[in-house]
C-alpha cells in the first residue's frame, strides 16, 4: 500500500490556491487541438468540492447567455494550467445546489467580510 501512496503523491499538485464552496474562481485550461495548444478560461462560483488524493474534483457554475453551465474539474489534472481565486464568498453550506433554482440577483453570493 505504501507504493500506491508514493505514486499518488508524485501526481498531486501543490500549486493550487486554497478555495472553498462559494468562492469565485477562474480556471485556466490547457486545450490541445491537433498540434496547437491554447488556454481557455472558465470563471464561475464553486458549488462543490470533493477532496481526496488524486481523485478529488470541484464543480464550477456560471451563467452564460441566460443558461446555467456547470463543469466538473479534477483537482490534480495536468490540463489545468492554473486556478485564480477572484473573490471569497460567504456561504453556510458546502454543497450549493440550491443556486440552480435561483435566478438573477437571488443567485448572487455575498462576499466575505474581511476585517
From Swiss-Prot:
Record protein name field: Large ribosomal subunit protein bL19
Q: What is the lineage of its organism?
A: Bacteria, Pseudomonadati, Thermodesulfobacteriota, Desulfovibrionia, Desulfovibrionales
Q: Which Gene3D superfamilies match?
A: 2.30.30.790
Q: PROSITE patterns, alphabetically?
A: RIBOSOMAL_L19
Q: Extract the Pfam families matched here.
A: Ribosomal_L19
- Signal peptide positions (record): none
What PANTHER family does the record point to? LARGE RIBOSOMAL SUBUNIT PROTEIN BL19M, RIBOSOMAL PROTEIN L19
Role played: This protein is located at the 30S-50S ribosomal subunit interface and may play a role in the structure and function of the aminoacyl-tRNA binding site.
Q: Which superkingdom, per the lineage?
A: Bacteria
Query: Can you tell me which family this protein belongs to?
Result: Belongs to the bacterial ribosomal protein bL19 family.
Question: A Gene Ontology biological process annotation?
Answer: translation
For this protein, what is any one GO molecular function term? structural constituent of ribosome
Instruction: Note the InterPro entries from the entry.
Output: Ribosomal_bL19 (IPR001857), Ribosomal_bL19_CS (IPR018257), Ribosomal_bL19_sf (IPR038657), Translation_prot_SH3-like_sf (IPR008991)
Amino acid at each position: 500500500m505504501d507504493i500506491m501512496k508514493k505514486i499518488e503523491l508524485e501526481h498531486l499538485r501543490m500549486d493550487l490556491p486554497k478555495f472553498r464552496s462559494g468562492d469565485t474562481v477562474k480556471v485556466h485550461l490547457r486545450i490541445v487541438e491537433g498540434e496547437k495548444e491554447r488556454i481557455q478560461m472558465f470563471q464561475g462560483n464553486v458549488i462543490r468540492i470533493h477532496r481526496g488524493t488524486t481523485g478529488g474534483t470541484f464543480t464550477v457554475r456560471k451563467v452564460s447567455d441566460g443558461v446555467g453551465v456547470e463543469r466538473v474539474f479534477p483537482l490534480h489534472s495536468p490540463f489545468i494550467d492554473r486556478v485564480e481565486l477572484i473573490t471569497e464568498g460567504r456561504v453556510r453550506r458546502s454543497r450549493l445546489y440550491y443556486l440552480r433554482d435561483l435566478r438573477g440577483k437571488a443567485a448572487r453570493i455575498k462576499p466575505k467580510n474581511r476585517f
